[in-house]
């Protein structure tokens, strides 16, 4: 009897879905990593450097001490009864852990919580949002999630009814969006960021793409904006954000604001402004614009990817729609409690009067300053290489250089049945052990080629990364020179 489950009888939406950040090149890298373990010395490098994904602690970044102290005490509250605890943990981490435990049913991080998350933790997040923006925030608008990604899936599930429902997505884009739209059976409507203006978002182009989609019978439901940009690293100007908000209001679009890199800004002339702040600054209220804002504990200076914490905040949705959002959230019961606690700590960190503040601030400032130096070093190194141009990384955790490949390399890629930038990235991996993501996995202007590289290898390893990359690139260009 034939297998009851085969590729040709799977859900076609699953087959259509792709996620390049953990695609073919990463799978090959994992095979090479196993080879290094079982056959040391068999490859021209001795380690795999995963520069494909924003996963800071996997590349050596240390967690923030205050956050981990609070988590440890919440996970093992019996420690709070021991006298020696006062010599091992700061006074404010002890007091914060006690406050948080008092909010949790049964004082147990292994218990289920309310489907939106623990109310006291949502209160703390709302307070942090209000402090950041200068406008009130409400805990009832906040849904705690296992990272930001489940919140994106939830909204796609809510908004997409069939293949004629479209979502405007920036190109280049984070593949979560194309994958989620495909899984839920919708249409991705691309709008192109302008590489020549530092990956600028031009509402005139968004308008053009919107009108084109509507002319094809697509009902465009929402606009995705990623700020700071992933994979492109730009930070939107405040004036640009005002234009975007007005555009969404005028066109009747939900604004999906991916703001998970809000702490990652490396240039003095740019500042993060949340879209919630922009909406309220324009005087828009609940009747004017549906807005969903995403935040995560995985990025920023904290980099707690494996803890799976995050939230989305909804404003501008009617009570009946909110009931449906809550219903979808309830199907998953709740997000993990550790991630919920971390999200509250990220949005409500130590204050200047707290015992931990000096060490917390030193850790935060040190991490962000080092990331800025690494971004600048990689940008400078890539711009020195033949055929590569790299815009300034104003924020986020990546550089996204454009690479002008020789025609012979493009032909070799075609013969190998690969996109030219994927061919380049695969050769880079096999020669150096460095893992990057080809630009074709994010979308790009047709006829251009890019790759995304994280800025996350530890600072003392950056010179070696640059050296290995430079040697490879020069050899590659010589091999395929026209």
From Swiss-Prot:
SUPFAM superfamilies: PLP-dependent transferases. One of its GO terms (biological process) is L-alanine catabolic process. The keyword Nucleus does not apply. It is an enzyme of class 2 (transferase). Its EC number is 2.6.1.2. Its cofactor is pyridoxal 5'-phosphate. GO terms for molecular function: L-alanine:2-oxoglutarate aminotransferase activity; pyridoxal phosphate binding. Pathway: Photosynthesis; C4 acid pathway; Amino-acid degradation; L-alanine degradation via transaminase pathway; pyruvate from L-alanine: step 1/1. InterPro entries: ALAT1/2-like, Aminotransferase_I/II_large, PyrdxlP-dep_Trfase, PyrdxlP-dep_Trfase_major, PyrdxlP-dep_Trfase_small. Keywords: Aminotransferase, Pyridoxal phosphate, Transferase. Pfam families: Aminotran_1_2 (PF00155). Gene3D superfamilies: 1.10.287.1970, Aspartate Aminotransferase, domain 1, Type I PLP-dependent aspartate aminotransferase-like (Major domain). The modification N6-(pyridoxal phosphate)lysine is found at residue 299. It catalyses: L-alanine + 2-oxoglutarate = pyruvate + L-glutamate. PANTHER family: ALANINE AMINOTRANSFERASE (PTHR11751), ALANINE TRANSAMINASE (PTHR11751:SF479). Homodimer. Transfer of C3 units between the cytosol of mesophyll and bundle sheath cells to maintain a nitrogen-carbon balance in the C4-dicarboxylic pathway. Belongs to the class-I pyridoxal-phosphate-dependent aminotransferase family. Alanine aminotransferase subfamily. This is Alanine aminotransferase 2. It comes from Hordeum vulgare (Barley).
């Amino acid at each position: 009897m034939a297998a009851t489950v085969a590729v040709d009888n799977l859900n076609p939406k699953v087959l259509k879905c792709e996620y390049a950040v953990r695609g073919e090149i990463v799978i090959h890298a994992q095979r090479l990593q196993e080879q290094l373990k079982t056959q040391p010395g068999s490859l021209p490098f001795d380690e795999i450097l995963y520069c494909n994904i924003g996963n800071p602690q996997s590349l050596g970044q240390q967690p923030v001490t205050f956050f981990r102290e609070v988590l440890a005490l919440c996970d093992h509250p019996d420690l709070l009864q021991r006298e020696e605890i006062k010599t091992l943990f700061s006074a404010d981490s002890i007091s914060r852990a006690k406050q948080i435990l008092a909010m949790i049913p049964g004082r147990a991080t292994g218990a289920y919580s309310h489907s939106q998350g623990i109310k006291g933790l949502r209160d703390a997040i709302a307070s942090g949002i209000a402090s950041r923006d200068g406008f009130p925030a409400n805990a009832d608008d906040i849904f705690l999630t296992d990272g930001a990604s489940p919140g994106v899936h939830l909204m796609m599930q809510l908004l997409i009814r069939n293949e004629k429902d479209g979502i405007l997505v920036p190109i280049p884009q984070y593949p979560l969006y194309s994958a989620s739209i495909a899984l839920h059976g919708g249409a991705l409507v691309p709008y192109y960021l302008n590489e020549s203006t530092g990956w600028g978002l031009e509402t005139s182009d968004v308008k053009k793409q919107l009108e084109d989609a509507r002319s094809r019978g697509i009902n465009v439901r929402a606009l995705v904006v990623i700020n700071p940009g992933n994979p492109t690293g730009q930070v939107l100007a405040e004036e640009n954000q005002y234009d975007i908000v007005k555009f969404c209001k005028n066109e009747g679009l939900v604004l999906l604001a991916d703001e998970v890199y809000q702490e990652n800004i490396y240039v003095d002339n740019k500042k993060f402004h949340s879209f919630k702040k922009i909406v309220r600054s324009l005087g828009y209220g609940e009747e004017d614009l549906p807005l969903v804002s995403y935040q995560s504990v995985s990025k920023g200076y904290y980099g707690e990817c494996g803890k799976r914490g995050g939230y989305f905040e909804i404003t501008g949705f009617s009570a009946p729609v909110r009931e449906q959002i809550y219903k979808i959230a309830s199907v998953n019961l709740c997000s993990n409690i550790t991630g919920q606690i971390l999200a509250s700590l990220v949005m409500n960190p130590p204050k200047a009067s707290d015992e931990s503040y000096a060490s917390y601030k030193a850790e935060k400032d040190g991490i962000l300053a080092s990331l800025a130096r690494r971004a600048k070093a990689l940008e400078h190194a890539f711009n020195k290489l033949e055929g590569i141009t790299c815009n300034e990384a104003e924020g986020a955790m990546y550089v996204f250089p454009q690479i002008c490949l020789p025609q012979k390399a493009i032909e070799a890629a075609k013969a190998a049945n690969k996109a030219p930038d994927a061919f380049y990235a695969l050769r880079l991996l096999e020669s150096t052990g460095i893992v990057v993501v080809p630009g074709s996995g994010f979308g790009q202007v047709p006829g251009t080629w890019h790759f995304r590289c994280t800025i996350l290898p530890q600072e003392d390893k950056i010179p070696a990364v640059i050296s290995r990359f430079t040697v490879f690139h020069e050899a590659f260009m010589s091999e395929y020179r026209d």
